[in-house]
Amino acid sequence: MGDVKNFLYAWCGKRKMTPSYEIRAVGNKNRQKFMCEVQVEGYNYTGMGNSTNKKDAQSNAARDFVNYLVRINEIKSEEVPAFGVASPPPLTDTPDTTANAEGDLPTTMGGPLPPHLALKAENNSEVGASGYGVPGPTWDRGANLKDYYSRKEEQEVQATLESEEVDLNAGLHGNWTLENAKARLNQYFQKEKIQGEYKYTQVGPDHNRSFIAEMTIYIKQLGRRIFAREHGSNKKLAAQSCALSLVRQLYHLGVVEAYSGLTKKKEGETVEPYKVNLSQDLEHQLQNIIQELNLEILPPPEDPSVPVALNIGKLAQFEPSQRQNQVGVVPWSPPQSNWNPWTSSNIDEGPLAFATPEQISMDLKNELMYQLEQDHDLQAILQERELLPVKKFESEILEAISQNSVVIIRGATGCGKTTQVPQFILDDFIQNDRAAECNIVVTQPRRISAVSVAERVAFERGEEPGKSCGYSVRFESILPRPHASIMFCTVGVLLRKLEAGIRGISHVIVDEIHERDINTDFLLVVLRDVVQAYPEVRIVLMSATIDTSMFCEYFFNCPIIEVYGRTYPVQEYFLEDCIQMTHFVPPPKDKKKKDKDDDGGEDDDANCNLICGDEYGPETRLSMSQLNEKETPFELIEALLKYIETLNVPGAVLVFLPGWNLIYTMQKHLEMNPHFGSHRYQILPLHSQIPREEQRKVFDPVPVGVTKVILSTNIAETSITINDVVYVIDSCKQKVKLFTAHNNMTNYATVWASKTNLEQRKGRAGRVRPGFCFHLCSRARFERLETHMTPEMFRTPLHEIALSIKLLRLGGIGQFLAKAIEPPPLDAVIEAEHTLRELDALDANDELTPLGRILAKLPIEPRFGKMMIMGCIFYVGDAICTIAAATCFPEPFINEGKRLGYIHRNFAGNRFSDHVALLSVFQAWDDARMGGEEAEIRFCEHKRLNMATLRMTWEAKVQLKEILINSGFPEDCLLTQVFTNTGPDNNLDVVISLLAFGVYPNVCYHKEKRKILTTEGRNALIHKSSVNCPFSSQDMKYPSPFFVFGEKIRTRAISAKGMTLVTPLQLLLFASKKVQSDGQIVLVDDWIKLQISHEAAACITGLRAAMEALVVEVTKQPAIISQLDPVNERMLNMIRQISRPSAAGINLMIGSTRYGDGPRPPKMARYDNGSGYRRGGSSYSGGGYGSGYSSGGYGSGGYGGSANSFRAGYGGVGGGYRGVSRGGFRGNSGGDYRGPSGGYRGSGGFQRGGGRGAYGTGYFGQGRGGGGY
């Protein structure tokens, strides 16, 4: 092995070059490995090797690099010593001969569908017309981004970055805002004589309608186009946002100047100054620690009209790394005999370590031939496979793949392309004695499809997953053998694997490319570059029957192969047909008064249910006009199911619904009905969040006489095929997440699906016999639907993708995204870079810092990632990981009403926090499941919690913790702890402080009832699903008016979701950017006024700077957390003290009568009598918890109980939170923060002994296989 290393050294020496090796340890302490990378100047390739010792890792890396030199004909293979790895013959790479590029298009394409009577006669011819609006010819792709970056390198405009973020980020974009941009754009149009027209699209049902405005303009002086597409609650706002994006792009391209006038701010409501009661003693301690840290505090201003900024600059910077000049490409190499592509590691031991490719190929061929002869079941399956439509195209597909680097296969859902194409390729290689040269990775957009397809392919090959076929999805992997195998994975998993390159993989198949999610679009850019650098690799793109011309053009006019399905005709019906067939009469409307923000005055002209053709009877018209377009009519779905029964055509019914809530409610609605709840029906939910074993049930056949009804999201639209479906009932809606950057607004809209979506859904019905599809939208509505959905890259923040670009060394973020199939607007890219620089994830040269490298590996929002690292420093890593993981999934509460009931609110204790409620739920569930699955189920039913969500959260949390541990963080800073939510708990105080950092800039101020003010004093409401949402219109007073929240949701009104009460000191410390003082009042972020001494505020902002500096040191070497120097320890203790509510003079116990809206509803008593769920004698909520629910915290008389009940539970130890600022329950301020004992907890409370800790360590001891993303 060492010979290869010497050979490379000698070869380089002759050319006056030296190979540079970089070795790093990877894996955790128990499974230490070494990863080695070797680079040689002048070659854009990184050789990689790994092994259990450094020497072998270097040899393996050298061998990989030498293999590369052989492939590019720099070295002859016979010159290489003891090579043992023959290079495969280069695959012929003829440039594309567009054989069958457009072929004859199938007749099921695009265009508005005809009425069902004329369905067969009409031939839709709108394929080309429904183009995606590619901005200009191919050379123009993203050129504006490239232009901007080349200019930016010449003149680094740093000044704008620090300026004020008006609509959160105007300073970044030349101070252009919603107010001033549109007028400037119009001036530009007049000067350039451009006719600028906005194209509007309506999104969402009428009660919650919003608009998308888009425009493309041609810039003469640059010779290229720019494009913007923005979202707003009305046409005017959408147009303003669109104009803003265009003007900001023009500014960055140097076409438009920065705005120099005064920015007129809409005056939001002003917030009264809030008096902070900080004790003298605490202020004195603050000053001491600031002196110890050698920080200078600015004196108060002499003139109060000229306030001073208190923010201290960065105390520690990461040293800038070398700027990466060459544009990187993910390294690729063909399969090699001692490399396992699925684990990205060398095979150093066992028979495969020294086997030649010829031996491997011969063995695998013999094995397959023997199996084909002997296995009768396999022969039967082969005959079944022969019948699939795609089989007729096998030779054409294989020929095209061997002749072209990229091939697109387009075929109707169900034609067999997903399961068969990988097998065609694999069997062809095995039978031609080239098994060792073939490894195929197939990406799927969702976990369920990756797993179900892998299991199906394994079944078709007469094997279990793990042999020639395997899968890898987040939280679960069964990897196949290292040679001649197929691996199905989600796109996210493949992107995570790209860090090690696509080595040892001969074919990459990307399925469902038409879905246009951000990860697939990102992967396509990567693959396009890989193909240009390594033409021998083979890329196969597969799509449903939609317009693929855009992809074809993107991949250099590659050939398209049409696969015609053998799907049966599907008769389709619209809402008016469904009503007429079933004689449906809507139930009388609910008379209850509706909440303003759920409803909106219906615009009659836009309610398409009022438009009904003359061919329908008056009863149909009347019924239709009574149905509200915004609601999904459950009763009509029931009527259709009964109607289907009368047809006497057996088959499963697939119902498409938007989102989990509706699926869950519909399932319960049907099960409560004696007709559908009987043994004649099997009602099954299908959603990405439900456990795998539940998902699998949808594929199982049902006994004769039983009807299977599947309630699904759009997951069943293209990703998976359920064979026995004959009927589709389509709500015609789907849930999308829209994000608007300039105001940090998330909008989860249930929107009308596109025509393409409806076409796909319809196609699910004709699998086994002629089918039927019932669209629950009127024909008039159908005509108004968009043709395609917006690509995700236009509606999500780009900072996570930006981190991936840097982690994979793909060059500049902007230059890379400019190559996307539809490049995102320039302003969104600049925002992503700015966010990452602010977080210290990028250095001055825009390369990843050590912190950025860790954040890039965490599959979570970068800001949350940094919050988790801070959590580790404070030894509350587990809780922060739990909260971060929980934000990735829906809330676990099963809730029929809008507002949460007491059973769920109780989990917040008296912390007024949705995040604490989540943490408590998780803690209680984790405790309950120690008693086994039955106990877990009982607990979830009793507390009305979604067990699947809790399990997914647990898996995500474990994955996040593993990544941190593998990055070098000590395990003991991530051990599970027990928190109390009803009494003082300083660890919980710290968790809330860090949370304020994680969700910034989402800060709000409570005014009255549900009304809150957010940034710059804009109005919003407390979201109804919050534990803080009052029950009625009675006014509420919280111990502190300040809250942080997870996200702003826009329905009719704007509401803040996921709220947690914080103190003004926590805001100053972790949730502020700009802090100014005039000597009397401290102004935070230009809108929150605090009455606090100038010195105290200055000291607290100094602590923040010291904390940020500590994060810099810790991320360079995470192990130092366990032995910090005394000054840093004292600094952390100071932050712990400031995080206490009592430090700001706030007493959380005041709020124990907070929900005093009359007596507690009697029906809730059955959930919460006594101390809750018991297991084997010891109550799960024993001690601290139990008394919190019933006798303590909320008073034995329910929420309205006397405020003294807390003291009855914990009487007189320093008066609860009002105890001296030194720590009340814990005794002195240096109390044992990390230990499980320490004052309050020592008293027993909610403790399960060492069990929980032991479980945690045990889990990590075992380690986890595969995993991926």
Swiss-Prot record:
Region listing for HA2, in residue ranges: 831-919
Region ranges (Necessary for interaction with H2AX) = 313-952
* Location of the region described as Interaction with BRCA1 in the Swiss-Prot/TrEMBL record: 230-325
Q: Where is this region: Core helicase?
A: 398-809
Region (Interaction with CREBBP) location? 1-250
Where does this polypeptide localize?
Answer: Nucleus; Nucleus, Nucleoplasm; Nucleus, Nucleolus; Cytoplasm
**CDD domains xref list:** DEXHc_DHX9, DSRM_DHX9_rpt1, DSRM_DHX9_rpt2, SF2_C_RHA
Q: Which residues bind ATP?
A: G411, A412, T413, G414, C415, G416, K417, T418, T419
User: Which keywords has UniProt assigned to this entry?
Assistant: Acetylation, Activator, ATP-binding, Biological rhythms, Cytoplasm, Cytoskeleton, DNA replication, DNA-binding, Helicase, Hydrolase, Immunity, Inflammatory response, Innate immunity, Isopeptide bond, Manganese, Metal-binding, Methylation, mRNA processing, mRNA splicing, mRNA transport, Nucleotide-binding, Nucleus, Phosphoprotein, Repeat, RNA-binding, RNA-mediated gene silencing, Transcription, Transcription regulation, Transcription termination, Translation regulation, Transport, Ubl conjugation
Name the segments for region: Necessary for interaction with RNA polymerase II holoenzyme: 255-664
The modified positions for Phosphoserine read S87, S125, S321, S449, S506
Q: Name the cystine pairs.
A: none
Positions of modified residues (Asymmetric dimethylarginine):
R1166, R1218, R1234, R1241, R1248, R1264
**How does the record describe the protein's post-translational processing?**
Methylated. PRMT1-mediated methylation of undefined Arg residues in the nuclear transport domain (NTD) is required for nuclear import of DHX9.
Protein name in UniProt: ATP-dependent RNA helicase A
Source species, please? Pongo abelii (Sumatran orangutan)
